[in-house]
Amino acid sequence: MGVVRSLLLFVVAAVTEIGGAWLVWQGVREHRGPVWVGLGIGFLAAYGFVATLQPDAHFGRILAAYGGVFVAGSLLWGVAVDGFRPDRYDLAGAAICLLGVAVIMYARRV
């Protein structure tokens, strides 16, 4: 159950951080206004709290592993929201990052 909870928290973290950054981008770069920016800031703040819910107690490990989730999640967000089409190098890079997440977070430690 710990791994499932951790993975779900990584997904929530990705949605809050990537979504927050996207909202700020929309507010500033796409001129959608301060409400979008404010919502984005709120989502980004929520991301900071979500990370604290991870079962592992080591901040550095959590953030290092989340970096890989962020890479893959950003590509997925681009596909779903912005019509981005990743090439094979994007996909290979994301796969390598997710492998890193698995090693950092879930490898059996002795």
Swiss-Prot record:
It is a multi-pass membrane protein. Pfam families: UPF0060. It is found in: Cell membrane. The keyword Membrane applies. SUPFAM superfamilies: Multidrug resistance efflux transporter EmrE. GO terms for cellular component: plasma membrane. Belongs to the UPF0060 family. This is UPF0060 membrane protein Francci3_2786.
